[in-house]
């Protein structure tokens, strides 16, 4: 079963590089990787997709992500059939597949607002509501190791999908059985790049909900060490702290470098002490009072 499933990925519906990688798995005397890659389909669950990157039906790649996006497109077109133009937002951290997803949405006649660069998940959620979109996705594996990628789907309220939309979307995704059913050829006229203007609105709206502006004013110069751990937080969190009135933000330069390889940590999870080692060291060097860290998509 696994071999026949893998052989179906050798057809012209799949690109040459993918076919070559699948053939290499088939030719390998050790079948472990072949089995892991094809023994099941990567499941689109209530939280979207998450898995190891690579070729195969049980891996994150342009075809499994493509099927998820095509299925979501099909459901949006059913659910919002009365709208002249369905709109979605696409955000991403330092992982892949945002542009592929934009092409698929637009090929289905859906207007896409694509962030020009990596942005935090909370900002993507905000943008769904700010621009009056019907859905949004973010390509991120959050704090999982570099081998992983993920795909989270959101509804028009800016929250992750709940019933009945999650189950209905899953049903549509499961109907996609072959790469030939995925519309990859995008419509560039329906893809709009967004960035700084949304950042400014987002940060401005955040400052309006400060719980204690007076306390910030009194302690504006406290030393705060911040690290994004190579993720999206670097784009928004330092300017947000500045907008709130904090004047002494200390960076961890090695971890300001955006990279899906997360070169300074084993796992980019800020809940693990090892991920904070460089930030704590910087705090000791500078006599800082607070260490802040965010995970790669800055939702924790």
Question: Predicted segments — roles?
Answer:
Residues 65, 98, 102, 166, ...:
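Short, highly selective alpha-helical patches that border small-molecule cofactor pockets
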Residues 89-148, 247-300:
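N-terminal small/polar loop signature for handling phosphorylated ligands or for N-terminal nucleophile
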Residues 4-101, 192-220:
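An N-terminal, well-structured beta->alpha segment
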């Amino acid at each position: 079963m696994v071999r026949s499933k893998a052989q179906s990925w050798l057809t012209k519906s799949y690109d040459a590089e993918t076919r070559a990688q699948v053939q290499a798995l088939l030719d390998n005397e050790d079948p472990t990787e072949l089995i892991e890659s094809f023994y099941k389909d990567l499941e689109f669950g209530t939280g979207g997709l998450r898995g190891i990157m690579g070729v195969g039906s049980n891996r994150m790649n342009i075809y499994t992500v493509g099927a998820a996006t095509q299925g979501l497109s099909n459901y949006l077109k059913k659910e919002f059939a009365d709208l002249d133009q369905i709109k979605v937002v696409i955000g991403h951290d330092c992982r892949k597949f945002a542009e592929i997803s934009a092409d698929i949405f637009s090929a289905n006649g859906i207007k896409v607002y694509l962030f020009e660069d990596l942005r935090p998940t909370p900002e993507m959620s905000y943008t769904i509501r700010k621009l009056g979109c019907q859905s949004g996705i973010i390509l991120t594996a959050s704090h999982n190791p570099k081998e992983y990628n993920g795909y989270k789907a959101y509804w028009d309220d800016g929250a992750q999908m709940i019933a009945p939309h999650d189950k209905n979307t899953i049903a549509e995704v499961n109907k996609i059985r072959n790469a030939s059913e995925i519309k990859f050829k995008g419509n560039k006229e329906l893809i709009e790049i967004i960035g700084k203007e949304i950042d400014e609105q987002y940060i401005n709206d955040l400052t309006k909900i400060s719980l204690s502006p007076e306390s910030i004013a009194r302690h504006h110069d406290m030393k705060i060490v911040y690290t994004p751990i190579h993720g999206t937080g670097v784009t928004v969190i330092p300017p947000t702290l500045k907008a709130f009135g904090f004047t002494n933000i200390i960076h961890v330069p090695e971890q300001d470098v955006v990279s899906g390889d997360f070169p300074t940590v084993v796992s980019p999870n800020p809940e693990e002490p090892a991920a904070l080692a460089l930030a704590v060291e910087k705090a000791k060097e500078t006599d800082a009072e607070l260490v802040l860290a965010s995970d790669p998509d800055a939702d924790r």
